[in-house]
Amino acid sequence: MWDLLIPGNRGTLVRPGGSDVASHTIFTGPKTLAETILPPFGVGDLRAEEGKVSGLKLFHTTNSGVTEVMPRLAAVEADVQDLVEAHMETMLGVTFLASEYVIDCVDGGRIDSLGLDENGAPVIVEYKRGTDAGVINQGLYYMAWLTNHKDAFRNLVRDRLGGTAASQILWSAPRLICVAGDFTRYDAHAVREHRRSIDLVRYRYFGSDHFGLETVASVTGHSASAKRVRRRAAGAPPVRMQGGAMAELAEAVDEVLVGLGDGVTRVQRKQYAAYQRLRNFACVCPPQQKKLLVYLKADPKEVDLVSGFTRDVTGLGHHGTGDLELQLRTERDLERAGDLLRLSYAAA
């Protein structure tokens, strides 16, 4: 039995052994960005920093007491890369495409991992064992190459996932995910200065059986298709969409999803709008005449399904991601769905 004591912030804890990787998200009250990011440290301080991961403590519990499982960094960077690549969809919500991808340019280079996220956006993942001041600039260099060589990436997607996936790549919202032992406060500031979608993700091993991921900073690039969603000012009247009751309901759903927490990103596709943290937690389809369909990442088997309100769509084709379908017709339905929306948000 494992007991988690978490004073603040969120992350994902997974068991790194075998193909049946179990994962869950741990979520508590939010911290400020400054509180979650450790000050810069040198190579000589790495050992001291291994136990400092935003106050997270993991305990092994028995009838006779508890034993703390000390966090540690990977022995080598490749250990982290191999683990994440083997379970990238579970850990990051990204379909793995290629490892150590050699780019064809004058200066050369190898992209650690290439992938495609749930909404079809290209993803570059870079790894560092500890703290590395150059990881963001290195990733941005690779992203610039990627956006200038779309055919190469499109061919890779076609070879791995087929022609349909290759034709639906979301080029307006490429992403960079940096997975490292830690980041400095300067890193967190730097990502805000770039007009790109960047996630800084901190990792730790806990003993030999557990592996933790924690998003410490997330910034979305300025584009029409993928933009950081900001909550409306307190007391300001909601801005309603044109198009009748269902359009107004869609706007109300948008306000609720945005209000679930800081750092929510809306990615607009033709068939749906995805709301994500590191991964999607809700997808909202365009309003129908009498109802609005919302798809969540909640497990339908853990929900009391109600005919005409919730439906298990596991294995069924639909736009967006998620196995639980919500059918909303009124704002009262939206109120009923509150717990399910929060459950899906926490799982992302």
For each feature predicted by the language model, list its residue ranges.
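Basic nucleic-acid-binding interfaces
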Residues: 326-328
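Short amphipathic alpha-helix segments
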Residues: 298-306
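Charged, terminal alpha-helix-loop-beta segments
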Residues: 2-259, 265-268, 272-283, 289, ...
